[in-house]
């Protein structure tokens, strides 16, 4: 529960007009030496404007996704999945291939993702890297 003083102050603030509220915000910025909106707006604009370019440059972890496996190449793809994913059993690899689209490797470096993509694509799998 808020004290009576806080409750009374809150009721006073509710009664302010929009112009009075703007004046209050400006005075509070001057008195306390803070800025209410500038850092948020600058960060928001920079993040929104640079997001696509920054995401492409800064991505360090990738996910290799098995999008599809042609029926006539499933055996080769299952073998390739077992080579790419260490410690994966035959049944798990078969379930992964038959359950496509599914991630094969997650949180890997670009080089590792490219190597996995190359091995799986060579076996005939449809692969995507995100």
Swiss-Prot record:
GO terms for biological process: translation. One of its GO terms (molecular function) is mRNA binding. GO terms for cellular component: cytosolic large ribosomal subunit. Keywords: Ribonucleoprotein, Ribosomal protein. Pfam families: Ribosomal_L12 (PF00542), Ribosomal_L12_N (PF16320). Gene3D superfamilies: 3.30.1390.10, Single helix bin (1.20.5.710). Belongs to the bacterial ribosomal protein bL12 family. Forms part of the ribosomal stalk which helps the ribosome interact with GTP-bound translation factors. Is thus essential for accurate translation. Homodimer. Part of the ribosomal stalk of the 50S ribosomal subunit. Forms a multimeric L10(L12)X complex, where L10 forms an elongated spine to which 2 to 4 L12 dimers bind in a sequential fashion. Binds GTP-bound translation factors. HAMAP family: Ribosomal_bL12. This is Large ribosomal subunit protein bL12.
């Amino acid at each position: 529960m808020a004290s009576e003083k806080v409750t009374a102050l809150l009721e006073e603030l509710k009664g302010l007009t929009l112009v009075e509220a703007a004046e209050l915000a400006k005075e509070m910025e001057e008195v306390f030496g803070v800025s209410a909106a500038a850092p948020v707006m600058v960060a928001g604009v920079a993040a929104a404007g640079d997001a696509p370019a920054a995401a492409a440059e800064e991505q360090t972890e990738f996910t290799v996704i098995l999008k599809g496996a042609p029926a006539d190449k499933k055996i080769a793809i299952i073998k390739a999945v077992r080579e790419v994913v260490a410690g994966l059993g035959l049944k798990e690899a078969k379930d992964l291939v038959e359950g496509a689209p599914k991630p094969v490797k997650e949180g890997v470096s670009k080089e590792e993702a490219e190597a996995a993509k190359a091995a799986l694509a060579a076996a005939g799998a449809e692969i995507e890297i995100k």
